[in-house]
Amino acid sequence: MEGHKAEEEVLDVLRLNVGGCIYTARRESLCRFKDSMLASMFSGRFPLKTDESGACVIDRDGRLFKYLLDYLHGEVQIPTDEQTRIALQEEADYFGIPYPYSLSDHLANEMETYSLRSNIELKKALTDFCDSYGLVCNKPTVWVLHYLNTSGASCESRIIGVYATKTDGTDAIEKQLGGRIHSKGIFKREAGNNVQYIWSYYSVAELKKMMDAFDAWEGKGVSYWRVPHELIECWTLEERPLLGSLRHMAPIRKRRLITFNEADESVNYKTGPKPVRFLGPSTSTQIKVKNSASVTVSPASAIQTSAGATANRFQSGSRRKAAQRSAPSRATALVGTGAPGHPQASPGAASAENGGTHLPPAKVLLSDKKPTPQRVIKLKRTPLCATAPCLPSPTATRQANSLKPLPGEAARALGVRTENGKNKGN
């Protein structure tokens, strides 16, 4: 059994001698097209001519047969030489093989085969194919507006214009006719995409009798006109394909409407400055100040600091005058204050006794610099009886009343005043 199967496989693989060129092919590939000559030759119904080696002899061009054999195996090779392509077509016709003349022919054959097998309309298959490449499946055409005027023996024929779309051509017709386009003497007829306007004194029935093939107009020109005597005008808008080869024409890309959000989010292929976006009261421009990221100032602290600075400036003038009058007593007060056994006045109390108001400092957080300790100079003010009373400013009085020292601080301040009074008496 195994030997019988091997013999059948050997018989299915055939050796061919085509014009002195030796090829090997399967019988199934040679019979791919059922109605071809090769399918009839290798179907087994007819005896085959063989040479001394047992190869089947085919008296044709072996060089061209290679293209056909590759095509039967599913590979398409189109020669670049025009003469070779013509000779290959003759060889394919001889064997009954539908070998494509060009790539477009090959694609058309594949499209037709696919449509028949899948039961899909060919137009839809072509449209899907063009959509996959983003192309428009349409042949470029133009719209030609032709004018014909016959009056007796005279005849005028000219082209008014060539337009890209039918709408532009229709607008040109309306401009030419003006108000006559809606009159009873205007007759309009259409054939396919083409349109024609006829103006005359004849009725439609009379025009059908006078004009050759009036009802059989296919929208192709106005060459059939045979109208005697009376004046007749005709405007014909006809769609015509562009002349010349389309080989050098760039493919027409489909237009795609892009919304604002899509265009904003998509990749910008054009290099250049981007537009400034409005983000409220100011634009997106950012102005940075050195160490501004770590500084936090509360509004209340800023107001208290400004008020305290005003009060300190007012009180400093009074202290300067009092210091000039009582320099000896100030030295004694400094010695008595630093004596052991007597409590030291706190910085807050000392500043309050000097006539200034102690305000809570503004909340300043500097991450780059370490906080430095404040240097406090302790000065004792002379007794109130020795100096002239000075009236504090309303701002200083208001802030002094708003600050309530702790009971311990108040006791220490009173103790300092009592001790200073004793020293003064001594």
From Swiss-Prot:
GO terms of biological process kind: protein homooligomerization
This protein's name: BTB/POZ domain-containing protein KCTD18
Region of interest: Disordered: 305-371, 389-408
Matching InterPro entries: KCTD18_C (IPR045704), SKP1/BTB/POZ_sf (IPR011333), T1-type_BTB (IPR003131)
GO molecular function, one term: identical protein binding
Underlying gene: KCTD18
PANTHER family associated with the record: BTB_POZ DOMAIN-CONTAINING PROTEIN KCTD18, POTASSIUM CHANNEL TETRAMERIZATION DOMAIN-CONTAINING
Source organism of the structure: Homo sapiens (Human)
Biased composition (Polar residues): 305-317
Transmembrane segments: none
CDD domains cross-referenced by the UniProt entry: BTB_POZ_KCTD18
Domain spans labelled BTB: 12-80
